[in-house]
UniProtKB/Swiss-Prot annotation:
Species the sequence originates in: Streptococcus uberis (strain ATCC BAA-854 / 0140J)
Cross-referenced HAMAP family: Ribosomal_uS13
Name of the protein in question: Small ribosomal subunit protein uS13
Gene Ontology molecular function, alphabetical: rRNA binding; structural constituent of ribosome; tRNA binding
Gene, per the UniProt record: rpsM
Compositional bias segments (type: Basic residues): 106-121
Subunit record text: Part of the 30S ribosomal subunit. Forms a loose heterodimer with protein S19. Forms two bridges to the 50S subunit in the 70S ribosome.
Coiled-coil parts of chain: none
Short name of any one Pfam family annotated for the protein: Ribosomal_S13
UniProt KW keywords: Ribonucleoprotein, Ribosomal protein, RNA-binding, rRNA-binding, tRNA-binding
One BP annotation, GO: translation
Amino acid sequence: MARIAGVDIPNDKRVVISLTYVYGIGLATSKKILAAAGISEDVRVKDLTSDQEDAIRREIDSIKVEGDLRREVNLNIKRLMEIGSYRGIRHRRGLPVRGQNTKNNARTRKGKATAIAGKKK
């Protein structure tokens, strides 16, 4: 397995797919990286030369990925919570942030439903 940006990417997959295993690199970014490095998308990771791997690493170094990106996202969320914006309050309460209804659904954000005691008829 090749190690790129601190992540072991699978050898048997195409490079364009394998790069998406790195946090912050999706399919579109992966294609841009390979185009800039001058590498075909159809090449398998195990067939890459060390020069090609180095070219990919150089391109990825110019992009914010993995730990740096996670840290930035978390800092942005903390900033929203500190300034007391609506989105920050929703994050703090563990509710959906992007305007979804919460009357019936939103179980992923709210957690498991708890029974209300003494509500028998």
